[in-house]
Structure formats: structure tokens, C-alpha cells
Amino acid sequence: MPEDAAVAGGETGALVLFSGGQDSATCLAWALDRFPHVETLGFDYGQRHRVELDRRAALRQGLTALDPAWGRRLGPDHTLALAALGEISDTALTRDSAIAFARDGLPNTFVPGRNLAFLTFAAALAYRRGLRHIVGGMCETDYSGYPDCRDDTIKALQVALNLGMERRFVLHTPLMWIDKAQTWALAETLGGRALVDLVVEESHTCYLGERGARHEWGYGCGTCPACDLRAKGFSRYLAARAE
């Protein structure tokens, strides 16, 4: 850790969970609009759609080009390897298997404990970097039913992390109560159509890691649950914008 990391971040610095997807890219813009120093963190857990991690550099570069102030605020990027999470997760996100729904209603893309692990490691890194604020793209409004995306889960984890690390971390989830259409609209509010275009072109959401097919909302297979949510949200966003 650089000696001046704590000084650069301090009590007002933020760490953004940054996968390279639409939600995390929007959250990064949200954080850059609010905090004077922002660092990013991605996780490699053997995910099938690892291509999303490869999009992070282009997104970071694009965001700094959109606003000089954002460029000054954007700090280092970090990547942590969590191979063990992939090894114990027999899911469609970590195995070459068809996406389906289980009897309990959860899709087999659910990786048990993923967000719990992500936020715990993020807090450990934030502790070392001297950053108080942790930003994630979890959402309870327009999601696949993942229990670790729920607001109650995040609030409970914030309490546990603060008790376990003797800190006063603040977990921010700016997308928690908005749907995908509103997420696109938030991007426009933060950075205009230029940010929307950046998210369309450079972010990746598709669970299958498909990067060959280009749609008006971005790249992906067009049929997996992630593509479906993104496509429908983009369509509703355009419709609302035209009113």
C-alpha cells in the first residue's frame, strides 16, 4: 500500500465494487460525482463471463475522459483472485451449463455468498487503503431474486463489518430501489448521453460472456436473464425519454 493511500482517501474516500458491468459502471460514475477520491475493485472468481473484467480499463478511461474532475478523483484499480469461490460454486456462472430456475425460484446463476464475500474483502481492502465508503451495485427492485442483493442483507453486513473491523464503514447501494430503466436514466443524469453511450459500448452484462453480438443496448447473447433485464430496461428508458 502506498504510504499516502490513507491521506488520499481518508474519511471521504470510496471503494467501488467494479465488475465491468452496467450497474457497477453506473455506480462508479455515481461515486466519482460525490467523493474526492475513488478506487475500484474487481474480483476474478472463475466466472464464465470473465470478459466483463476485461472491460474495466476502457470504462475507467472513458469515465476520466467524460469529466476532468472525475479523472482527478479516480484512484488505483485493484483486482482480487477468489478462485475458491468458483471452486465451491456449482452454478451456471462458474460452470458451462444451461441457465435454469430451481424449485425455490432462484436461477442457477446464483453464487451463494458471493456478495457477502465481495463486501468482506472490499472492507478489508478499504481498511488497508484508509477508505470509509464502499459502493456496490446491489439492487432489490429489478433483479433475479438473489438474497445477497437485498437491502436487509447489506444493512446487516455493514453492522457486522463495522463490529469485526472496529471501523465505521458506510455501504452505499445507489441502485437498490431503482429498476434497469432508471439505472440507464441515472447514467444520463450523471454524465449525459455520453455516459449512456459509454456504458452501452464498453460495459458487459451477458452471463454467457458473449461479446460478438451488438444490440442497441450493448453486447451479449440477448437471451440470458442478464441480457433480458438490460435490454428491457434500455427499451423502457428510451420510451420514457421520448415522452
Curated annotation (Swiss-Prot):
Its EC number(s): 6.3.4.20
Reactions the enzyme catalyzes: 7-carboxy-7-deazaguanine + NH4(+) + ATP = 7-cyano-7-deazaguanine + ADP + phosphate + H2O + H(+)
Lineage: Bacteria, Pseudomonadati, Pseudomonadota, Alphaproteobacteria, Hyphomicrobiales
Organism: Methylorubrum extorquens (strain PA1)
Pathway: Purine metabolism; 7-cyano-7-deazaguanine biosynthesis
Positions contributing to Zn(2+) binding: C206, C221, C224, C227
Biological processes annotated in GO: queuosine biosynthetic process
UniProt function note: Catalyzes the ATP-dependent conversion of 7-carboxy-7-deazaguanine (CDG) to 7-cyano-7-deazaguanine (preQ(0)).
Protein known as: 7-cyano-7-deazaguanine synthase
Keyword Metal-binding: yes
